[in-house]
Amino acid sequence: MEDFVRQCFNPMIVELAEKTMKEYGENPKIETNKFAAICTHMEVCFMYSDFHFINERGESIIIEPGDSNALLKHRFEIIEGRDRNMAWTVVNSICNTTGVGKPRFLPDLYDYKEDRFIKIGVTRREVHIYYLEKANKIKSEETHIHIFSFTGEEMATKADYTLDEESRARIKTRLFTIRQEMASRGLWDSFVSPREAKRQLKKDLKSKGQCEGLLTKVSHQTSQVSTTLEPMWMDSSRMATLRASFPKCLEK
């Protein structure tokens, strides 16, 4: 799974996911399913934001890569992918500037057009179940929730999907492609089932002679990938800003 993640996702997303896991004391080489899930979630958040701007009349517009957007404001502020302290700094700054209420939990994005925080979810389960879990945890009408699944389903607060249909279709297509690529490499079942992931992890580590002292609580697998899945296009300037938001000590 680790090799698949490194070949499937944009290198900057992989780097941010590694830093995020290390920030919480997690090892992406062992907890590979979580590594894949974090990369997927980050990519969806960035795809949600990419190409969306606000013009001088306050209208939301879409600008494709290569078109001039120097004088336009990004519609979405990306919070996901920053280290925790920086993320809360951004949230506090937005709250002070806009007057919106401060969320209890870190959101993933802020929508300057609708003046609301957004929590993005990507689930391997039923979308309505995952949506209810998120809603019960957040318990705030000020944070908008938008859930995507790997099967093309989605669910959002008050059925308000924020983005146009084409933008959402890009995200759904990407998630479906990731699922298909995982399945073709025999990785999907363990990605969905913690029990299967735990069994596969033990098997893989044993074959590498790394099973000594392994905590059986770990529920993620490591596997090998030989082919490459095309990484998505990324807004490099915004990604560079996110990379810079992590303290240098996390590089160790």
UniProtKB/Swiss-Prot annotation:
Domain of life, per lineage: Viruses
Keywords: Decay of host mRNAs by virus, Eukaryotic host gene expression shutoff by virus, Host cytoplasm, Host gene expression shutoff by virus, Host mRNA suppression by virus, Host nucleus, Host-virus interaction
GO molecular function: RNA binding
One Pfam family in the UniProt entry: Flu_PA
Location of this chain's protein in the cell: Host cytoplasm; Host nucleus
Site (Important for efficient shutoff activity): 202-203, 206
InterPro entries: PA/PA-X, PA/PA-X_sf
Main location: host cell
Site entry (Important for efficient shutoff activity and nuclear localization), positions: 195, 198-199
GO BP term, pick one: viral translational frameshifting
Active site positions: 80, 108
Family: Belongs to the influenza viruses PA-X family.
Domain observations: The probable endonuclease active site in the N-terminus and the basic amino acid cluster in the C-terminus are important for the shutoff activity. The C-terminus acts as a nuclear localization signal. The C-terminus is recruited to host protein complexes involved in nuclear Pol II RNA processing.
Function description: Plays a major role in the shutoff of the host protein expression by cleaving mRNAs probably via an endonuclease activity. This host shutoff allows the virus to escape from the host antiviral response. Hijacks host RNA splicing machinery to selectively target host RNAs containing introns for destruction. This may explain the preferential degradation of RNAs that have undergone co- or post-transcriptional processing.
UniProt name for this protein: Protein PA-X
